[in-house]
A protein has these predicted regions:
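C-terminal ends of transmembrane helices
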Residues: 65-76, 112-124, 199-209, 249-258
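N-terminal signal-anchor module of multipass membrane proteins
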Residues: 1-64, 324-328
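Structural signature of hydrophobic alpha-helical transmembrane segments
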Residues: 49-61, 98-107, 182, 186-196, ...
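Long hydrophobic alpha-helical segments that form multi-pass transmembrane helix bundles
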Residues: 124-200
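Membrane-interface helix-loop-helix junctions at boundaries between adjacent transmembrane segments
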Residues: 84, 89-157
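Loop-to-transmembrane alpha-helix initiation sites
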Residues: 126, 130, 237-244, 265-268, ...
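Hydrophobic alpha-helical transmembrane segments in multi-pass integral membrane proteins
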Residues: 99-100, 143-150, 231-238, 274-289
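Alpha-helical transmembrane segments in multi-pass membrane proteins
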Residues: 32-40, 55-67, 83-88, 92, ...
Length: 328
């Protein structure tokens, strides 16, 4: 290994963060998460056709190539640790099914170059890169980012449809059949967020392997559900609709951009849930998961500062030394 990619501490060389001990190395964790993400990726291609595959490939390959180029320009070691591939794949799963490939490339390049590498690379980024890329695309291409198609509409003249969270969404059928379609994925939306079932299965796998903290998705989803009840909304609808499932299980649980303690993660998830509710209920956009998580990413250092447990032997600055107290 090159020393410029390591932090030297005495005689010990420590790799860059995240320093998470789960019995797996960081690359192994990344590749397990990547393998789990193949579940919603496969569902995306099944529901939305071949163009969804091009979106996934374009975003993932761009992320890897951009990270490779930047690392080489900075004369730092490039590692195929899987983090760039995860960023590219997650970004792709949050995009509309007809997103032009060139826009996908721009968003993926932004996610890696600006949201990740500009901060120093893996372990140093403040914001979730995939969500930062999605937010960038939403600002630059707002019309294209809100064009949705029902699964199966693969023809060139397919008509756009509203997502369930949109006020213009009209469902012809019973509430139970709507829940069923939202649970299995037969609704309009981003290519990787429509099937709650697939995302829940993926989340359970990660929790069972102890690769993510169960507190974040459970508290996040629970906050949205409880808040919906308080606001007089349909809790089941609010939980199944939009990007809540993919955000709770795969975005908010990011090691680097979420707090390090259980209490901190609980506060983080609660805040994300409340912000999601506020944006959905009072904001100009029907969906609030992306910006809710990004806002809480910004609060992560503050949460860690005040929630992180004090080390053994900690003494307040204002405290007097023991010998001084004895002499007084």
């Amino acid at each position: 290994m090159e020393e410029n990619n390591l932090i030297k501490s005495g005689e010990i060389l420590i790799s860059h963060p995240p320093h998470i001990w789960k019995g797996f190395s960081t690359p192994k964790i990344m590749y397990i998460v990547l393998a789990v993400l193949f579940l919603p990726a496969g569902a995306a291609v099944y529901y939305f056709g071949l163009h969804a595959l091009w979106i996934i490939l374009a975003s993932t390959i761009t992320a890897i190539l951009v990270e490779f180029a930047i690392r080489k320009l900075r004369k730092k070691r490039f590692s195929l640790d899987g983090s760039a591939a995860i960023t590219g794949l997650l970004l792709a799963l949050t995009l509309p099914p007809r997103m032009p490939v060139w826009m996908v490339v721009i968003g993926s390049a932004f996610a890696i170059a600006i949201a990740k590498e500009a901060f120093g690379g893996l372990g140093y980024n403040i914001f979730n890169p995939a969500l930062a890329g999605r937010a960038f695309l939403a600002i630059c291409f707002p019309v294209m980012m809100t064009e949705w198609y029902m699964p199966g509409n693969f023809s060139a003249d397919a008509v756009t449809s509203a997502t369930p969270l949109s006020e213009s969404y009209i469902y012809e059928g019973t509430r139970a059949s709507l829940y069923k379609d939202m649970f299995f994925g037969n609704i309009a939306g981003s290519i990787g967020e429509t099937s709650a079932l697939i995302l829940i299965i993926g989340g359970i796998i990660l929790i069972s392997l102890k690769l993510i903290d169960w507190r974040i998705p459970i508290i996040y989803i629970g906050t949205v559900a409880a808040g919906a009840v308080i606001l007089g909304q349909d809790a089941i609808f609010q939980v199944l609709a939009g990007g809540l499932m993919i955000g709770a299980f795969f975005m908010a649980t990011d090691y680097v951009t979420s707090p390090v303690t259980p209490l901190g993660r609980s506060i983080f998830a609660l805040g994300a849930g409340l912000i999601t509710l506020v944006i959905r209920r009072f904001g100009a956009m029907p969906e609030g998961v992306c910006f809710a998580i990004l806002i809480m990413n910004a609060f992560t250092p503050l949460i860690d500062k005040y929630v992180r447990p004090r080390p053994f032997g900690y003494v307040k600055k204002s405290a007097k030394p023991v010998n001084e107290k004895a002499n007084s």
